[in-house]
Swiss-Prot record:
The keyword Protease applies. The gene is ftsH. Residues 749-765 have a biased composition (Polar residues). Residues 1-27, 235-765 are cytoplasmic. This is ATP-dependent zinc metalloprotease FtsH. PANTHER family: ATP-DEPENDENT ZINC METALLOPROTEASE YME1L1 (PTHR23076:SF97), METALLOPROTEASE M41 FTSH (PTHR23076). It is an enzyme of class 3 (hydrolase). Keywords: ATP-binding, Cell membrane, Hydrolase, Membrane, Metal-binding, Metalloprotease, Nucleotide-binding, Protease, Transmembrane, Transmembrane helix, Zinc. Zn(2+) binds at residues 536, 540, 615.
Length: 765
C-alpha cells in the first residue's frame, strides 16, 4: 500500500552491468601480447648469452694451434685453442663459426678463394672431426686440418715437425708457422708446400659461457611452461567472469568459484515514513526498531532485548517492501535486500553457504537490516510434502534458523521479511527470538486509499473536478500498487489525447483498465451477442439491487475488456471489514449466478452462453469454503480442509462418504442461491429490461443512472435524450443511404444503351 512516485530513482544499488564477451576476449589477447613482449625483453637482458669473438690471427703457441680473437662482448680478448677439447662438451651446441679462407696453390699461380662456414657442431668421438667447417675439417686427435676443394684434397699436419703423409696433394704447415710473419715465397722456393698459406679469420665465433650454461638451459626450458601457466590462469579467470556476467553460469558475475557467495544487494535507502501513506498502526510498530538502530545503548542499559526479526505479511502490493525501506531510510543504516529464491541453486548446500555469507557481511556492516522478500520460498514448513526431511531447502532453512538465533551471537542486525502467506512459514522461524513481531499489512480502507492517491498525485496535473475521495470510494479492494497504476494509466491516457491535465474520464477508463484490461471497442459484436451480454450484466446488477445487505452496484458496462464481454462493479455499503457474515457470502453467490439466471429466463436453456464461466468459479469457491472450512452448512462445524498452509493433493482428509456429503452440500448452496437470483429477475423483468435498454443506448451506466432506474422504473432524462439523438442519426443515415442507392440506380439506368427500332417497326409506323 505504501508507495512513492520515484521508487526506482531513489534507491542506488551496487549492481554491475554485464560485460561484453567480445571486449573481454580482445582485452585478454592484448594483455597476453603485452606480457609476451615484456617477458621477451627481460629474457634478452637477463639471460646469459654466448660471447661474440672476431678472429684476427691463427698461429702456433707453445706447440698448440690457437686463434687470437677480438671480443665484442663482455670478456675482452680471448684465446681460442683449436687443438684442445675445451669446447668439446655438451654445451657447445650453440657454437657457430664462419671463416673466410684464401688458398694459394703453387700449381695454381692465380690462386683460388673459398668461403666456408659451420655446418654442424663438434662431436666427442675420437675418430670424428672436432670442427667441420664446410669442406674444412680439423681433427684434434690426429692433428690434421684437411680442406677438400675442386682442385683436390689439401691437408696440413698440426704437429711440431714436418711430417710427410702418403696422401697425394698433401700440404704441410710447419711448427712455428705464423700467419702474420710467414715468408710464403721462401716456403715455395724450399719446396715446402704449405697447404694453407693464408687462413684469414674471419668471421664471428660465438663462445659459450660454460659457467652459466646450466642456468641458461634451465631457464630456457622452464620459462615457456611458466608463460603457458600464466596465460591459462588469465584466460580462465577472464572466461569465468565473462560467463558469470553473461548468465551462462550465474547472474551478477557469479561462477563456479563464487557460487556460494550471497546474492544480497546492498542498497542505501532514502525513504522516510512520510513517503508511506496509510498503515499508521503498522508504522508505529516499526518506530521502535528505528529507535533501536539509532540508539542501541538505551536498550542495553535497561536490559531489554530488541526484536531480532519482523515479518510483514499481507496481500500483494500493500507496501511491505516499502515499509522495510522506510525503516532503513529512517535509521540511516545499510540495507541488505535479497529474495528467498536467491539462496537456492543447482548445487546442494549452496543455500546454507549463502546464508552464512549473508550474515557474515551483515556483521561487518552492523548495525544494519537484512530484508528477505518472499521468504516463504525458503522458510516454508519443513517436511511438508517430501518423503525425506533432508532436502536442500530444509538445509537452507536450518542454517537461517541457526544464524537468527543460535550459539553465535549477533548484535545490531535486524532481519525483516515479507510474505503473502504467513500460514506456510515454519513454526520455528516464527517463534520469539527469531521473528518476534508479526505485522499484518492489509488492503487500504477508503481513508488510506485517499491518502495513497494524494501521495501519487503530487507530481501529476489533475483537474480540479476530480475528487480523490470519490476515486477512493470506487476502488474498494485496491492495493497501493493498483492505485498507483490507476493514476499512471490516467496520466498516459491524458498524454495520448494531448491534454495538459488528467480528467475524470481518464481516471474512469484507468480504473476499468486495472480491473478488466483495456477496452476492445474494435471487436465486432453482433446485435444478438450485444443484447445477450447486456441481459447477463443486468442480471448481476438486478440481483445486487434487490438483495438486502448486498454490495452497491457502482457501474455496469458491456464494452469488451480482456476476455470479458462486460462487467458489473459493486462495492461494500458499510465499513470495509474482512469479517463476512453467512448472509454476505450467500448474497455474493446469488449475485454471481444472476447473469446465468437472466440468460436462461430471457433466451431459454438452449441459448445460454459461456459468459458465466468465471461466475461459476467464484460461486463454487465461496460455497466450498463455507462447507469445508467455515462450518456454514448442514454438515456442522467440522473443518474438512485446513484453512492455513498448503493442501497436499495426495492427502486424504476425509472418507469417500464424507466427500460425497460435501459435494451435496456445495451443490445445495449453489442451487438455492441460483433459484434466489432467478426469482428476483423473474419478479423484476421490467426493471431489468430498462437496464438492458440503457446499456444498449449508452454501453456504460454508472451508479446515478442505476439508482434512478431502480427507484423510478424509467430511464433517466439524459439517456432518453441520447436515445432520441441516436434515432435521429439513424433515420438520417438511412435516408442518406436510400438517396445514395437511388442515385446509383439512376446512373446505372442512364448508362445502358437504347435499342434502335427494327425495320418492321418502322414500316408499321
Amino acid at each position: 500500500m505504501s508507495n512513492t512516485s520515484n521508487f526506482n530513482e531513489r534507491v542506488t544499488e551496487n549492481a554491475k552491468p554485464p560485460k561484453n564477451v567480445k571486449s573481454i576476449i580482445w582485452k585478454t589477447i592484448g594483455i597476453i601480447i603485452v606480457m609476451a613482449i615484456i617477458i621477451g625483453l627481460i629474457l634478452f637482458y637477463v639471460l646469459p648469452r654466448n660471447t661474440i669473438a672476431n678472429i684476427s690471427n691463427i698461429q702456433y703457441v707453445d706447440g698448440n694451434l690457437v686463434a687470437t680473437a677480438t671480443i665484442n662482448g663482455r670478456s675482452g680478448r680471448f684465446i681460442l685453442d683449436l687443438e684442445n677439447s675445451t669446447y668439446q662438451t655438451s654445451y657447445t651446441s650453440g657454437l657457430s663459426l664462419s671463416i673466410s679462407v684464401f688458398l694459394r696453390n703453387l700449381n695454381n699461380a692465380n690462386g683460388q678463394s673459398f668461403f666456408v662456414s659451420l655446418i654442424r657442431p663438434a662431436t666427442s668421438s675420437a675418430n670424428d672431426a672436432v670442427f667441420n667447417i664446410a669442406n674444412l675439417s680439423i681433427n684434434q686427435t690426429r692433428g690434421v686440418a684437411t680442406l677438400v676443394t675442386e682442385g683436390g684434397s689439401y691437408s696440413a699436419v698440426l704437429t711440431t715437425t714436418l711430417t710427410a703423409l702418403p696422401l697425394t696433394g698433401q700440404k704441410f704447415l710447419p711448427e712455428g708457422f705464423n700467419l702474420d710473419t710467414a715468408n710464403t715465397d721462401a716456403y715455395r722456393a724450399a719446396g715446402a708446400i704449405p697447404g694453407i698459406q693464408r687462413l684469414l679469420a674471419v668471421g664471428n665465433v660465438q663462445l659459450p659461457n660454460q659457467s652459466t650454461a646450466i642456468l641458461t638451459q634451465f631457464l630456457t626450458s622452464i620459462i615457456p611452461f611458466v608463460i603457458l601457466i600464466v596465460i591459462y590462469i588469465v584466460i580462465a579467470r577472464r572466461f569465468s567472469r565473462t560467463m558469470g556476467a553473461g548468465g551462462a553460469i550465474g547472474e551478477d558475475g557469479e561462477n563456479v568459484f563464487t557460487i556460494g557467495k550471497s546474492q544480497a544487494k546492498l542498497a542505501k535507502s532514502t525513504f522516510k515514513f512520510t513517503d508511506v501513506a496509510g498503515i499508521e498502526e503498522e508504522k508505529s510498530e516499526l518506530i521502535e526498531l528505528v529507535d533501536y538502530l539509532k540508539r542501541p545503548g538505551k536498550y542495553v542499559q535497561m536490559g531489554a532485548r530488541t526484536p531480532r526479526g519482523v515479518v510483514l505479511y499481507g496481500p500483494p502490493g500493500t507496501g511491505k517492501t516499502l515499509l522495510a525501506k522506510a525503516v532503513a531510510g529512517e535509521a540511516g543504516v545499510p540495507f541488505f535486500q535479497v529474495t528467498g529464491s536467491a539462496f537456492e541453486d543447482m548445487l546442494v548446500g549452496v543455500g546454507a553457504k549463502r546464508v552464512r555469507n549473508l550474515f557474515a557481511k551483515a556483521k561487518k556492516a552492523a548495525p544494519c537490516i537484512i530484508f528477505i522478500d518472499e521468504i516463504d520460498s525458503v522458510g516454508s514448513k519443513r517436511g511438508k510434502y517430501e518423503i525425506s526431511a533432508g532436502s536442500a531447502t530444509d538445509q537452507t532453512l536450518n542454517q537461517l534458523l541457526a544464524e537468527m538465533d543460535g550459539f553465535s551471537t549477533r548484535t545490531g542486525i535486524i532481519v525483516m521479511a515479507a510474505t503473502n502467506r504467513l500460514d506456510v512459514l515454519d513454526d520455528a522461524l516464527l517463534r520469539p527470538g527469531r521473528f518476534d513481531r508479526h505485522i499484518q499489512v492489509n488492503l487500504p480502507d477508503i481513508k488510506e486509499r485517499e491518502a495513497i492517491l494524494k501521495i501519487h498525485s503530487r507530481n501529476k496535473n489533475i483537474s480540479s473536478k476530480v475528487n480523490l475521495l470519490d476515486i477512493a470510494r470506487r476502488t474498494p479492494g485496491f492495493s497501493g500498487a493498483q492505485l498507483e497504476n490507476v493514476l499512471n494509466e490516467a496520466t498516459l491516457l491524458a498524454v495520448r489525447a494531448d491534454r495538459t491535465s488528467i480528467s475524470l474520464t481518464d481516471i474512469d477508463e484507468a480504473i476499468d483498465r486495472v480491473i478488466a484490461g483495456p477496452a476492445k471497442k474494435s471487436r465486432v459484436i453482433s446485435d444478438f451477442e450485444k443484447n445477450q451480454v447486456a441481459h447477463h450484466e443486468a442480471g448481476h446488477a438486478l440481483v445486487g439491487l434487490h438483495l438486502k445487505g448486498a454490495d452497491e452496484v457502482q457501474k455496469i458496462t458491456i464494452i469488451p475488456r480482456g476476455q470479458a464481454g462486460g462487467y458489473t462493479l459493486s462495492t461494500p455499503k458499510d465499513a470495509e471489514l474482512n469479517l463476512k457474515k453467512k448472509s454476505d457470502l450467500l448474497n455474493m453467490i446469488a449475485g454471481a449466478l444472476g447473469g446465468r439466471a437472466s440468460e436462461e429466463l430471457f433466451f431459454g436453456k438452449d441459448a445460454i452462453s459461456t459468459g458465466a464461466s468465471n461466475d461459476f468459479y467464484k460461486a463454487t469457491n465461496i460455497a466450498k469454503t463455507m462447507v469445508t472450512q467455515l462450518g456454514m452448512s448442514d454438515l456442522g462445524i467440522t473443518q474438512f480442509l485446513p484453512s492455513e498452509g498448503g493442501i497436499n493433493p495426495n492427502a486424504r482428509y476425509y472418507s469417500e462418504n464424507t466427500a460425497q456429503r460435501i459435494d451435496e452440500a456445495i451443490a445445495k448452496i449453489l442451487e438455492e442461491q441460483y433459484q434466489v437470483a432467478y426469482n428476483i429477475i423473474k419478479d423484476n423483468q421490467n426493471e431489468l429490461k430498462l437496464i438492458v435498454e440503457a446499456l444498449l443506448i449508452q454501453e456504460t451506466i454508472v451508479k446515478n443512472d442505476i439508482d434512478y432506474i431502480h427507484e423510478h422504473l424509467k430511464l433517466p432524462e439524459a439517456i432518453i435524450k441520447l436515445k432520441e439523438e441516436q434515432l435521429k442519426e439513424k433515420a438520417a443515415a438511412e435516408k442518406e443511404e436510400q438517396a445514395e442507392k437511388a442515385k446509383l440506380d439512376h446512373q446505372s439506368d442512364s448508362a445502358q444503351p437504347q435499342e434502335e427500332p427494327t425495320a418492321s417497326t418502322a414500316s408499321s409506323n
